[in-house]
């Protein structure tokens, strides 16, 4: 069994249940950083409905194309896909109700840059969710050596200008960190942030 296989993944990870933990709801905007083929982005689009929006960012153009193809077959017109590196891609400023990382924060070459961009994209009242592998032996998954434990991931998130709300275990092999923007660390104060699009929420939703 491969943890990259979307179909087998459904046997050990429930996207809808995990999204439910974040408070994401109808009319909300979610940015899925490292979206792959849309394992979380497509369920989120169903939840968001026609008044919401989901943007998936991934460096793998083929995966983004498959996500958009599946969205089209379902009639999900509220899904957008962007091919790009998380370190270099910012789709808006202060537009997102939810910035989502689905078992991938450990994969980025520079997670500090990625989280810096997340801080700029999230709304003042929005949420960042980091779902990732526990740093322990599991039947499959990425090498333990590249995984972040909960404390390391939480420290990176705090350093990017967030306040940790809670850390939860997600059986069988994961943890989930929910964080909110720290008003004492406003966006734009972090040197690791890269330039990108600078759309307001209203412009983004047009």
Can you say where each PLM-predicted feature lies in the sequence?
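A short acidic, Gly/Pro-enriched loop at the edge of an enzyme's catalytic core
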Residues: 87-98
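Conserved beta-strand signature within the Rossmann-like core of class I S-adenosyl-L-methionine
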Residues: 125-132
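Class I SAM-dependent methyltransferase SAM/SAH-binding core
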Residues: 31, 37-88
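Core SAM-dependent methyltransferase catalytic element
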Residues: 169-206
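Short alpha-helix
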Residues: 146-160
């Amino acid at each position: 069994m491969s943890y990259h296989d979307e179909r087998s993944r459904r046997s050990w990870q429930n996207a809808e249940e995990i999204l439910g933990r974040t408070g994401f709801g109808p009319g909300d905007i979610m940015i899925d950083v490292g979206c792959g083929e849309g394992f979380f982005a497509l369920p989120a689009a169903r939840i968001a409905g026609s008044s919401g929006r989901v943007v998936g960012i991934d460096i793998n153009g083929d995966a983004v194309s498959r996500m958009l193809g599946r969205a089209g077959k379902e009639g999900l017109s509220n899904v957008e896909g962007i091919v790009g590196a998380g370190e270099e891609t910012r789709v808006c400023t202060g537009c997102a109700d939810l910035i989502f990382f689905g078992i991938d924060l450990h994969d980025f070459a520079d997670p500090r840059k990625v989280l810096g961009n997340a801080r700029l994209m999230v709304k003042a009242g929005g949420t960042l969710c980091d779902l990732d592998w526990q740093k322990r032996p599991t039947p499959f998954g990425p090498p333990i050596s590249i995984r972040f434990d909960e404390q390391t991931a939480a420290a990176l998130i705090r350093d990017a200008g967030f306040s940790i709300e809670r850390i939860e275990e997600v059986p069988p092999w994961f943890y989930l960190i929910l964080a909110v923007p720290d008003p004492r660390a406003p966006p734009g104060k972090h040197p690791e942030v890269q330039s990108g699009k600078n759309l307001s929420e209203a412009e983004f939703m047009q």
